[in-house]
Regions:
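C-terminal catalytic lobe of FAD-dependent flavoproteins
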Residues: 110-111, 263-344
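Dinucleotide-binding Rossmann-like beta1-alpha1 core, especially the glycine-rich loop
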Residues: 52-111
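Mid-domain beta-loop-alpha active-site segment that forms a flexible
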Residues: 107-126, 168-170, 244-251, 313
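Active-site substrate-recognition segment that forms the wall
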Residues: 22-30, 39, 47-54, 59, ...
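A conserved short coil-to-beta-strand element within the FAD-binding core of flavoproteins
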Residues: 133-148
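Short hydrophobic core segments
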Residues: 12-14, 37, 158-170, 314
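N-terminal Rossmann-like FAD-binding beta1-loop-alpha1 element of flavoenzymes
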Residues: 9-36
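Core beta-strand elements of the Rossmann-like FAD/NAD(P) dinucleotide-binding domain
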Residues: 6-9, 152-162
Length: 344
């Protein structure tokens, strides 16, 4: 791999969500010329188009892999946000309070909210990165050390020495015809959030100064509030659902009853907005990061924790590629590795 890096620093990243944008930024900082391609016109058109989301640690009784990785992930996310985003507008290191029924509240100081599209745009605006939208990749072909991307008309879209697939649920489709590539069985999970204008909550005497998490999340930014999200494997429609809007109001009642009372007339009059995205999850709920074969890497399947996982996973990929000291211990690197699918 060292010789491969020495001979060329030209790379394509397929997918312009949080994972793809963070991966592109990590590689570009190390001198790579990165082209990011996506089937959509603007970046962050998939699940990363969420109006606002949380980065926060996941707490488990047994301190499982997800807990350990998320604890490191929030540090990388916060570092990246401080460098690229405008505090109070694009993100806020506000801390997050977790409330779960029958359990004491937990305060997470190293957590907060981020507008994912702002993070994606900021990453793609870095030096050494070129953005190409409306590029629907049909198949990948390796010829020697060169990877070629073809579109639906079998026309060449782009060529490079290295390719990183960060295309969420489409990653499995792109790999299916690549010889010796693993078969990835992702779970597509629909999520709907409900949101509106923040001024509708400002009269609340218990107006929260930080997001509330647990069985859903309630977030307030500089201009809006948001509650969600649903988790649905059976319905993958991108059309908003009234049923899910009702479910989100029930989440709000459980998390922040005072705010729910303030917003009840807004919900009843149908004056709220809804956003729907499709997450990409593995069966073990951990992302996939690593090298499939020379010049072909993957960094995807962030599920509902893209803001917590993606900056860390991007740095892990770059660290593996460049033989750097890694941000995770060997057990956690193995837990995320594509090799867990290569063996099957």
């Amino acid at each position: 791999m060292g010789n491969h890096i020495a001979n060329s620093l030209n790379c394509i990243v397929i997918g312009a969500g949080i994972a793809g944008a963070c991966t592109a930024a990590s590689l570009a900082r190390r001198g790579w010329q990165v082209t990011v391609v996506d089937a959509a016109d603007p970046p962050a058109s998939g699940a990363s188009g969420l109006p606002v989301g949380l980065y926060a640690p996941y707490i488990s009784a047994d301190n499982n892999f997800t807990s350990q990785i998320s604890a490191v992930g929030v540090q990388f996310t916060q570092k990246l946000a401080r460098r690229l985003l405008l505090e109070g507008v694009d993100w806020q290191p506000s801390g997050v309070m977790t409330r779960k029924y029958g359990e004491p509240e937990q305060w997470h100081a190293d957590a907060g909210w981020i507008k994912p599209a702002a993070l994606v745009q900021a990453c793609l605006s870095q030096a050494n990165i070129t953005w190409r939208g409306n590029c629907r990749v049909k198949r990948l072909v390796q010829n020697g050390e060169i990877w070629t991307l073809f579109d639906n008309d079998d026309q060449v879209l782009q060529q490079a020495d290295m390719l990183v697939i960060t295309a969420s649920n489409q990653s499995a489709d792109l790999l299916q015809d690549v010889p010796h590539a693993p078969k990835l069985n992702f779970q597509a999970v629909r999520g709907q959030v409900t949101y509106g204008n923040l001024k509708e909550t400002k009269t609340s005497p218990q107006h929260p100064t930080h997001p509330i998490n647990g069985g859903g999340s309630y977030i307030e930014t500089d201009t809006q509030w948001l509650i969600g999200a649903t988790y649905d494997r059976d319905n993958l429609s991108l059309e908003p659902s009234i049923r899910d809007q009702v479910d989100n109001f029930e989440r709000l009642e459980n998390l922040v009853p005072d705010i729910a009372e303030q917003l009840k007339p807004t919900f009843e009059r149908g004056l709220v907005k809804n956003w729907v995205g499709i997450r990409c999850a593995t069966t073990d709920r951990l992302p996939i990061v690593g090298e499939i074969m020379q010049g072909l890497w993957v960094c995807t399947a962030m599920a509902s924790r893209g803001l917590t996982f993606a900056p860390l996973c991007a740095e892990l990929l770059a660290g593996l590629l460049h033989h750097e000291a890694l941000p995770l211990n060997a057990r956690l690197v193995k837990a995320l590795s594509i090799q867990r699918y290569m063996r099957k």
